């Protein structure tokens, strides 16, 4: 029996991409309840249908949540515990991309203030608000194995003279995760981070708006030495970190796919 079987999980950004792949794998391994938060509701029905085909006994609860809103995040997580009585694990996957290759040197002078705030609001503040609220509700539950996984990026290891907001948000996400991990480990809560490389998700074309097709994007990255992974590859690492199989790993930042440059 899987160590996530019969347990309750929360997944931000869970309606598509890596988040949806994580939900499907949790269902495949017997999770009792998966609570999905996403600002985009259009994929909720298809996600629920796909999970029903994988495991009809897994309950999927989808909620529209803007992770950059403290109120949205707090209400969602408190609602999970109020309704289901527990929360064993959470994956904070919600995030947005930033287009590369649109700026000319000096690229820093073309970094837009509004885009900077928007990217950091979702990719960094959203992770902070979610992790803080998850720790708060988990702390008040009976002592048990509990795990939180945040999703950063290979950009956390990179020094690219472009996409400053995205790289900063992901580097800060990884740093934040390791600090929180050291803080809460003694409360029985493990916190870890996953940093995907180039991953085939709906966000991928948004990073390379000048490239017309997915095949061309894959070729571009392959020529730079970066193979393309699938969302399911990342999901396997997230679910492992959520499970008791990964005890006592905490404060880790695991790259999935391309290695750090």
UniProtKB/Swiss-Prot annotation:
Top-level EC class: oxidoreductase
Gene Ontology BP term (one): indole alkaloid biosynthetic process
EC number: 1.1.1.332
InterPro entries assigned: NAD(P)-bd_dom_sf, SDR_fam
Swiss-Prot/TrEMBL keywords: Alkaloid metabolism, Glycoprotein, NADP, Oxidoreductase, Signal
Cysteine-cysteine disulfides: none
Residues reported to bind NADP(+): 18, 66, 132, 166, 170, 201
UniProt entry tagged with the keyword Heme: no
Complex formation: Homotetramer.
Role played: Chanoclavine-I dehydrogenase; part of the gene cluster that mediates the biosynthesis of fungal ergot alkaloid. DmaW catalyzes the first step of ergot alkaloid biosynthesis by condensing dimethylallyl diphosphate (DMAP) and tryptophan to form 4-dimethylallyl-L-tryptophan. The second step is catalyzed by the methyltransferase easF that methylates 4-dimethylallyl-L-tryptophan in the presence of S-adenosyl-L-methionine, resulting in the formation of 4-dimethylallyl-L-abrine.
Protein name: Chanoclavine-I dehydrogenase easD
Lineage of producing organism: Eukaryota, Fungi, Dikarya, Ascomycota, Pezizomycotina
Gene: easD
